[in-house]
Amino acid sequence: MASNKILGIDLGTTNSAFAVMEGGDPEIIVNGEGERTTPSVVAFDDGERLVGKPAKNQAVKNPDETIQSIKRHMGEDDYSVELDGEEYTPEQVSAMILQKIKHDAEEYLGDEIEKAVITVPAYFNDRQRQATKDAGEIAGFEVERIVNEPTAAAMAYGLDDESDQTVLVYDLGGGTFDVSILDLGGGVYEVVATNGDNDLGGDDWDHAIIDYLADEFEAEHGIDLRDDRQALQRLTEAAEEAKIELSSRKETRINLPFIATTDDGPLDLEQKITRAKFESLTEDLIERTVGPTEQALADADYTKSDIDEVILVGGSTRMPQVQDQVEEMTGQEPKKNVNPDEAVALGAAIQAGVLSGDVDDIVLLDVTPLSLGVEVKGGLFERLIDKNTTIPTEESKIFTTAQDNQTQVQIRVFQGEREIAEENELLGAFALSGIPPAPAGTPQIEVSFNIDENGIVNVEAEDKGSGNKEDITIEGGAGLSDDQIEEMQQEAEQHAEEDEQRRERIEARNEAEASVRRAETLLDENEEEIDEDLQSDIEAKIEDVEEVLEDEDATKEDYEAVTETLSEELQEIGKQMYQDQAQQAAGGAAGAGPGGAAGPGGAAGPGGAAGGAAEQGEEYVDADFEDVEESDEDE
C-alpha cells in the first residue's frame, strides 16, 4: 500500500541523503547499509548493478565500469557514459541512485513511496532542473517539487525559529557552489538573491591534490599516474581521504604501495601533505567563491552588516580554509548547529511536509537564479524575466517582424546574464507560423514566459492579428519525451526485479551453507548417539548440498531443494535423539529412588547437550546470514 508521505531527497554530486517528516520533525532515513548518507556512485560488476557504498568500494579494481559525480553533467544533451556495454544519459544514472533511495526508504518505512521533493543547486539552469525531474520520474517518483538546496538548508535551520532575520547560506558541495540570501520571519522563507558556480565543488579540491601527487611522482619517476585508470582511482580516493584528514589535522601522509611498475620492479608513492601546502594548492579555488558571494549581496542590496546568520551547507565547508574565508567575507562566525551533510535533505522533507499537509504555516518564496529571454534582431538577448525574480512568475512582451511580408518567426529562448544571446544558455527554440503578410514592424507578436514553482519554464508566442499560437515547455538534458521516460522507468523496474531475484538466490545459498554447518555441528557433538546408517545418510546429503554450492550456475530452486532434503534428515535425528532421551529419563527415574533427580538420566544428559548445541547453532546461523547478506551488498 502506498504511503501518503512525500520523501525529501538531496541528490548530491558525491553523496545523497533522504528524509521524511515524522511526528512533526524531519528525520534522516538510514540507507540499506545503515548509513545516513549514500555515495552518488553507480557501477556494474560482472553484469550486476551496484549503487552507493558497494559501488564506491569496488571503484579501484573496476574504474572503467564505475561512474561518480554524474550530477556535474545533468542537462548536457550530448553527454553519456558507457556501463556494461550500454550507453546511459546522466538522467538514467541519476535515476539508478534515486531508485536505490526509493527502495531503501520503502524498506525503512514499510510502505511504498510514490512522491518526492528533490533538491538542486540554486544556480542550476532550466535544463538541469528538468533533467533532475526526469531522473526522478525514471526512478518511479512523482516529483512534487524541485527545491533549491540553499533554500532547503535554511528551512532546516529556521524551522523552530520564528524571529525575523536575514540569513546567508554558503553551500559548497561536491560539484557545485551556491550562495543565497534569505529573509526569514513568521514562517516565510523569502529568497532575496542567489548566485553561484556550477563547476566548483569539493571534487576540485580533490583534483588539486591528485595533480600535486601525480606531478611529484612524474618528476621523480617519469611516469604520469593519470594515464592509468586504476592508479588514478587510487589517487582519487587517497586525495579525498587526505582532504578530510586535513580538516582536523595539520598534516597527513599518503602511502600507496605498488602504484606503478617498471622494468626494475614496482614503485610506491609516499608523500606528506601539510594543511598549509593543501591550502596553497587550492587558494585559487577558494577565491572563486568570493565573486558570487559579493554579487549575491549586491543583488540583494545588502552589506555584510545586514546579515544576521551564516549557514554552511555541504561537506566541503568542513575545511578550515573555507570557514575562514566565509568569516572574512561576512564578518561573523558561521553557525555550526546544522549538519552540512544532512541540512538539505531535512529541508526537502520539510517542504515535502508542507505539500502533504504535515507542516503548517510555512511559505517558501524562491527565485529564478538567471535571467530569461529571447534572441532579437542582431543576436541580442532581450530579457523578459530578470534573475532573482520570485517564482512562480509570468511576464509578457510584444515583439514584431524584422522583414516585410514575414509569415514566420523563430523564437529562441535563452537563460543567462550576457548581452549577446549566443553567449547564454540556449534552452530551446520553436517557430510561430501563419502570420498574415504585412510590412515589417506591423504584426504584434506577444511572447509570454511562465516559470512554475519548480523553476521550469514554459514559453508561448501568439500573433495578436491571426490568433495563431505556439508554445514550448523547456525540456532538460536530452529532452526526454513521455515515451522515453516510460521506457526508462520500465528498464529501471526490470533491474529492480533482477535485484530482487538476485537477493532471493543469495538468501537461498546462505541458508544452504547454514544447513551444512548445523548438520556438521550436530554430527560432531553427538557422534555416539546417532545411528550409523542415519549418520551416513546425513553425510551424503551434506555432500549433495556442497556440490550444489560449488556450482556457479545453481539457481535459487537448486539451493532450496538440497537444503530441504538435508533438513528432513536432521528432523529424523531430532526424533531419534528425543526418543533416546525419553528412554534414558524413564530408566533413570525408575532406578534412582529418592536420588533420581541427580541420577545420570537427568536434564544434563547427552540428549540435553545436543539440544543446547542445536539452539546455539540456530543463533549463529541467523547472525551469519545477516553478515553474508551485508557482505554481498558491499562487494
UniProtKB/Swiss-Prot annotation:
InterPro entries assigned to the protein according to its UniProt record, in alphabetical order: ATPase_NBD, Chaperone_DnaK, Heat_shock_70_CS, HSP70_C_sf, HSP70_peptide-bd_sf, Hsp_70_fam
Keywords: ATP-binding, Chaperone, Nucleotide-binding
Biased composition (Acidic residues): 522-536, 616-635
Gene3D superfamilies: 1.20.1270.10, 3.30.420.40, Actin, Chain A, domain 4 (3.90.640.10), Substrate Binding Domain Of DNAk, Chain A, domain 1 (2.60.34.10)
Keyword Plastid: no
Coiled-coil ranges (or none): none
Start-end of Basic and acidic residues biased regions: 492-521
Compositionally biased spans, kind Gly residues: 588-611
Annotated spans, Disordered: 487-538, 575-635
Domain of life: Archaea
Database matches in PROSITE patterns: HSP70_1, HSP70_2, HSP70_3
One GO molecular-function entry: ATP-dependent protein folding chaperone
Record flagged with keyword Glycosyltransferase: no
Pfam families according to UniProt: HSP70
Purpose: Acts as a chaperone.
HAMAP family the UniProt entry points to: DnaK
Family in the record: Belongs to the heat shock protein 70 family.
Protein name: Chaperone protein DnaK
